[in-house]
Amino acid sequence: MVYIICYDWPSTSGNHTGMRYLYEYIQKRNPELYKMYTFNMGRRFFDKGKKGKKISVLFTALKLAMAYKSGDKFILTEYLHRDSYQILFAKIIRFICPKAPIYAMVHLVPEKLERRYSKAQMKKSSRFVTEIVTLGSSLTCYLNNLGIENVYTSFHYVDNNYYTPSANLYNRSDDVKVIVMGALARDFEQIAYIVSRLPQIHFYICKGRENIDYLFSGLKNATLVGYVPEAELKHYMNDSDISLNVMKDTIGSNVICTSMATGLAMVVSDVGSIRDYCDETNACFCSSPDDFIEKIMILANDRELLNSLKKMSLKKAQQFSIDNYCASLSSLLK
């Protein structure tokens, strides 16, 4: 049996994204092989307080350790996330079941990891697991440079049965539209500057719960979209042509993969693991605000080039399909 220790985050709960959806999908395909334990990371979980959260994780770890049989494996989906207490989980399993294979997913950018742990603590935490699994080569390199060698580079999945392009993807009659999504390691001040310099282009700024309205005050070409249901967000994606990603870092993300699956041309910061997911056939790589402005204008004025990038985004998204991720996971666990 492969035991999956997963978390239900409010931001992705019930959506076709996130680790919970991924591993529910995997469990449904192979219920005799996978069994998932899910912690609710909404208010109910946090209201338990630090001690209560630890107790919940501790008892689950003890229960599974006592039930362990030779051949069983463990997947931890939020390793090195302090609120998950998965280091505690791994310690317990490793102490009671020293030969148990433990695969621990790490998908926070280095800046966030360093806010939570010293480099020595990260290196020590790697000793409790068989393999650390990342979603991008830049994070793998970062961990390798800390002296952590047991790292496997996977990729971020997308459910391209749900995230599909609009029927009129290549023959839009209206003006080009740009969508901005995601908050992790995003530079909203630069985004506001770009929007201000392109008054002829309309932008959907999907800000979620970020308090950034003041940055776009007076910009009539920007529609600010708060936290909305997944179907509504997909509507905005299907009404757009370009996915704009002004990032300080990326190690693989829902935004990049879902944007490609809906056939959006990618205009992205050339940082982190972005080239694991995009190349020059579907993306314009940028290193400054003026780069972004120039590339968006080029695409807005050249529909043939824009459609070419859209087509290649769709093609590349197939590589990161949820079914390909399932196959990759099976290979890792062998």
Model feature map: region roles:
Residues 298, 305-319, 327-331:
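A short, well-ordered alpha-helix in the C-terminal region of glycosyltransferases
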Residues 214, 271-285:
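Short acidic/histidine- and often glycine-rich active-site loop of Leloir-type glycosyltransferases
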Residues 207, 212-234:
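Nucleotide-activated donor-binding/catalytic signature segment of Leloir-type glycosyltransferases, i.e.
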Residues 155-175, 189:
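Acidic anion/phosphate-binding donor-loop and adjacent secondary structure
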Residues 280-290, 298-304:
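Conserved acidic donor-binding segment of nucleotide-sugar-dependent glycosyltransferases
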Residues 238-251, 264:
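Acidic donor-binding loop of glycosyltransferase active sites
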Residues 129-150:
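A short, active-site helix/loop in glycosyltransferases that binds the activated sugar's phosphate group
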Residues 170-186, 192-195, 204:
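Conserved donor-binding/catalytic core segment of Leloir-type glycosyltransferases
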